[in-house]
Every structure is written in C-alpha cells, then in structure tokens.
Amino acid sequence: MKKIIYDLGSNNGDNIPYYLLKSDLVIAVEANPKLCEIIKKNFKKDIDNGKLVVENCIVTVLPDNEDKDFYLHRQHHVLSQFLAPNKSILDQYLKVKLPSRNIISIIKDYGEPYYIKIDLEHYDSYILKELLLRNVYPKYLSVESHSGEIIDLIIQNGKYKSFKLVDGSQVPKRYKNRMINNINYSFPIHSAGPFGNDIDGQWMEEKNFLFLLSVVGFGWKDIHCSLEDKPSKYYFPLQIIFYSKKKVIRRVIKIIIFFMVIYFVYIKFFFNLRQTTF
C-alpha cells in the first residue's frame, strides 16, 4: 500500500525532509501563503517528481472551499492560528481571509493516510474529533497536546492502544545524527521530530502512558499513537520517568538523595541515642 503522510500545519517545511524519507507521498497543508512559497521553492524537485503536494489552505472541519478568517502572528509565524486569539493578545495578530478545506475532503483527494501529524495551534482537537468520528485511523497518528483533552479523546475512542511521547523542546538535541533509511539525519529546531519506531523507547499501554503524562505534564508535546505496534506491559515507574525529559530525572534524583540523607541522619541519631542510653 502507498505510504501517504499528511503534515497538517507544515509551517516552513521543517518536517518535510524526514517525511519524504519515510513515505511515497507527502501532503503538506499550510495556511500561511508566504510559508507555502518557501516550501514550494525549497522542495521544487520533490513537487515536480510527484513526491510532495502543497495545499495552501486552512484545514478545518467546516464546509469545503470557503474563505475564512485566519490570524497570522506578526512576529512568530509558528503561532499563527485559525481560531480567534484572546482579546488580550489580539493586537499581536494580523487577520486575513484565506481559502479553507475540510480535512476529510483533502484525504479523499489523496488517499488513505499512513501517518497524520496534527499541529494546528489550538485547533488540533477539532481535527482529531473529525477524524475519529469519520473512522479515519492512520497506522500512525500524532497530535500536539497542550491539555488532557487530546489523550481523553483518543482513549475514549478506544481504537489506539499503543502510545509514545515526543517533547518538542528536546527534539533537536535528543534526535541528532540519527540513521533514517541509511541517511544520517538531524531534526531541526521547531521540527515535530520522528514518528513511529524512530521515537526512542518502547510503546506504552494506556495506564503507563497516563502515568508518564502525570509526571511530565502537557505543553509543547506530541502524543503519538500506533495501530501497528503492540505496547510493552513491563514498563516500571522508574523506566517511565527515565523515558521523559532530563529535568524530571534530575528532580527525581534530588528527591531520592534528599530522603537518603534524611534516612542516614535518622539512623545516625538513633545509633548515637542508643549508645548514650546504654
């Protein structure tokens, strides 16, 4: 079967080189016209060879082919979004009219997805709900998760049983000089990072993954799901903690050291007390 990757929220194309290595066809969906021009310029050869398609549109769950309001961030293009920003920060955005397409319509045009990456600045849950409602289940799926809503939707649906986590802030350092299809590859800053079995660690079952999320929290983190891979049942709490970022590991080590010091102080005090008593 043809491997098709849907990059929903392509930005300036940081993920595309990796996705081209992992698929037969990449569908890059990006609302910002200037960023789409950058993608078209940088990947002209792949577009000409039929390996890459650029959809310059807002991806929505609404009726197809309608111009809609979109909010371009004036300083940081990665923060541009479809939903209206909070009034307190609205002046940081430029409101423009851009073409839109329904996510299901896009998939019907290009074919069954092998992997879908969703990174749409506060619109992620809308797209995820629509995919699950329409029974669109790619073998691999990732969604940026700033709250518990994403994992709740996935678990309530019940289709995906295997999970991994990618911390966006760690991607450039953690996934540097990796062998991808016999090519030495490093993921750039702002890249979504790897998917599938290119992510470090074993796949987790639900209860272990929820424990991991309780340790590391939400934010700039992508939840990855798989229909292809069975989860490991033998993750222990310390393994899960070491799966996560170094700050958490250091925090846990400090706590362990603290309690060890308390323990040895107590033992020494008790021993001295016994000596003075007898």
Predicted regions: what they are:
Residues 3-4, 18, 22-25, 104-254, ...:
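Conserved acidic-Pro-Pro-aromatic motif
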Residues 33, 76, 101, 121-122:
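Alpha-helix N-cap/helix-start capping motif
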Residues 57, 101, 118:
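Cofactor-binding loops of NAD(P)H-dependent oxidoreductases
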Residues 46-53, 93-94, 112, 137:
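A short helix-to-beta-strand connector/capping loop
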Residues 1-65, 145-147:
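SAM cofactor-binding core of SAM-dependent methyltransferases
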Residues 60-101, 105, 110, 183-186, ...:
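Glycine-rich adenosyl-binding loop in Rossmann-like folds that engage adenosine-containing cofactors
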Residues 44-46, 70-75, 134-135, 158:
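Short, hinge-like loop/turn segments at secondary-structure boundaries
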